[in-house]
Amino acid sequence: MMRTLITTHSLLLFLLLLQLLQPLQFQDMYYEDFYFPVSRTEEDFEDFLVEFQSTGPTRPPTKEKVKRRILVNPGMPLGDSGYCNYQIMRKNVYYKYSCVTEHYFLLMQYDELEKTCYNRFVPCKNGIRKCNRSKKLVEGVYCYLTEASNLPMCQYESFYRRGYVLITCTWQNEIQKLIPYTINDIVEPPNHRSLLNEDGVFVISP
């Protein structure tokens, strides 16, 4: 019990210190999106602690978790070379005590992303699993881990992407509907003239 209290309070102080250490210009411009602003509830923080410290299976995704970790608002330029380093730390995108090897941020509304779950299946980038592809072009950033040091100082290279997002989805019993699970890729449109029909299939114009 004592060990849990010490760990909990230490992590809380650590997260508060991170927010204080953010550059002042970032605090002014993007403060409303911070992962643990004052408006967050105690339940949000406890939920984060359970997931971060857990040694068991990863918790199933939720709508709020997807919105918090994947979706971003306009503000910081998507082409900024430090985009991933800033957003990964700000949104606490880690896997337990490790840096994630890759991650995607999408500039879109959750409802639009959720609709993608009901689009036609297409091959994922690994050619094995089935993915759903968006019907519209989406802007986003692909983050690739280049240096893994002690948390939270994970270093990433940022790549701006504009294309069709590939996602996997999972069924959530509580709300009886499909919700986004993982972002598989952002596929840039081909150079030749093309379009997507209503089924999400590429139709090549002559």
Swiss-Prot record:
InterPro entries: RNaseA, RNaseA-like_dom_sf, RNaseA_domain. It comes from the Eukaryota. GO terms for cellular component: extracellular region. Disulfide bonds join 99-154, 117-169, 124-131. Residues 1-26 form the signal peptide. Its main location: secreted. One of its GO terms (biological process) is defense response to Gram-positive bacterium. Keywords: Disulfide bond, Glycoprotein, Secreted, Signal. Belongs to the pancreatic ribonuclease family. Does not exhibit any ribonuclease activity. This is Inactive ribonuclease-like protein 9. It comes from Saimiri boliviensis boliviensis (Bolivian squirrel monkey). The gene is RNASE9.
